[in-house]
């Protein structure tokens, strides 16, 4: 390709950039108008709702359906996610609490779901995320609920038993672990590897093969592991890209997780109900009588209706010894007639039934 041809293409790209810039600016101005309309139509004492999970899910799905490449559907959706995030910040900046500290996979999940134009607040524990949302100190919270390798996150399930909360969304994050070192690390003298206990478990085979005699130290989070390594010459950390960037670490080895499909599912918790989108999930908690066949009675309505169960977990109940509650996720929205019928049947047999929320299936 000649220099003249390259120059012509660059001129064309510059022209396209100007058009993209103007269209994004026009969209932002439109978002500001939306905010004005919402504020002007509020009743006295009514709180405006600027973030609509069902609306954002619909926009992203439409983008992915209409995308013709060469960018992948996910790449295109991420671009639009950031545009929407920035436009929403013009209406009202969202405050989002997440399980911290900075640099954790939970923060990465929050950024993936809400974009980078939110005010993100790290919390020291999962229960603190719940309490911030309940108190109205933040708009939403992000908490891990299950990992494809390690299973359910029990602290999150138990927090749903203690707090009245609405699940507003979900986000799935591929978990890639890297062995990280600092500038002063002597890589041939590594005698200690820090990470969260779950991450150490998810990289067990790799560690056994490459660092069988090195001490493995479990810490509160992968971000904490990265922070410690920055000041030690004989240590390494297992963490992700966000922690590496935050603490200025480099990758000694990449993607060391034992399972290449390792992923974690996170829930978005808040205080607002989400209308149906046509592609939703519902999460419920059910307590049944402690008698033979109780679980069978619980599952029969799902089988008869053909509703797709996506997850079922059991946790000890807080009401008595040797009693349990079931956490169930299934496809559908609690406003759907079929789902309503199933929930009514379950309620008639259950000691207690609580709908945690219906929300759009993860788009990204």
Task: Give short role names for the model-derived ranges.
Residues 1-364:
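Domain-level signature for soluble enzymes in the chorismate/prephenate branch of the shikimate pathway
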């Amino acid at each position: 390709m000649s220099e003249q041809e390259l120059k012509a293409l660059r001129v064309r790209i510059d022209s396209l950039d100007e058009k993209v810039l103007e269209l994004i600016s026009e969209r932002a101005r439109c978002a500001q108008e939306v905010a004005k309309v919402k504020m002007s139509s509020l009743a006295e004492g009514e709180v405006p709702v600027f973030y609509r999970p069902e609306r954002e899910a619909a926009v992203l799905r439409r983008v992915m359906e209409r995308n013709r490449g060469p960018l992948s559907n996910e790449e295109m959706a991420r671009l639009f996610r950031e545009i929407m995030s920035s436009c929403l910040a013009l209406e009202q900046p969202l405050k989002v609490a997440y399980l911290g500290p900075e640099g954790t996979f939970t923060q990465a999940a929050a950024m993936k779901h809400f974009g980078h134009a939110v005010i993100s607040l790290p919390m020291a524990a999962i229960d603190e995320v719940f309490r911030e949302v309940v108190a109205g100190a933040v708009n939403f919270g992000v908490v891990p609920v299950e990992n494809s390798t390690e299973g359910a996150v029990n602290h999150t399930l138990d927090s749903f038993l203690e707090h009245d909360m609405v699940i507003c969304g979900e986000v799935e994050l591929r978990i890639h672990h890297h062995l990280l070192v600092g500038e002063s690390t002597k890589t041939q003298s590594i005698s200690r590897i820090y990470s969260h206990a779950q991450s150490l478990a998810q990289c067990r085979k790799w560690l056994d093969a490459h660092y069988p005699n090195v001490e493995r130290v479990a810490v509160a989070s992968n971000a904490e592991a990265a922070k410690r390594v920055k000041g030690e010459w004989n240590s390494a950390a297992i963490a992700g890209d966000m922690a590496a960037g935050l603490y200025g670490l480099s990758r000694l080895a990449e993607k060391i997780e034992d399972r290449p499909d390792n992923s974690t599912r996170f829930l978005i918790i808040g205080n607002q109900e989400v209308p149906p989108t046509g592609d939703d999930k519902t999460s419920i908690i059910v307590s049944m009588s402690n008698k033979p066949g109780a679980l069978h009675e619980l599952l029969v309505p799902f089988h008869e209706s053909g509703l797709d169960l996506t997850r079922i977990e059991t946790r000890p109940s807080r009401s008595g010894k040797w009693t349990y509650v079931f956490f169930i996720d299934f496809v559908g929205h609690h406003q759907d007639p079929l789902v309503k019928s199933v929930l009514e049947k379950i309620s008639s047999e259950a000691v207690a039934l609580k709908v945690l929320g219906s929300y759009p299936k993860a788009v990204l």
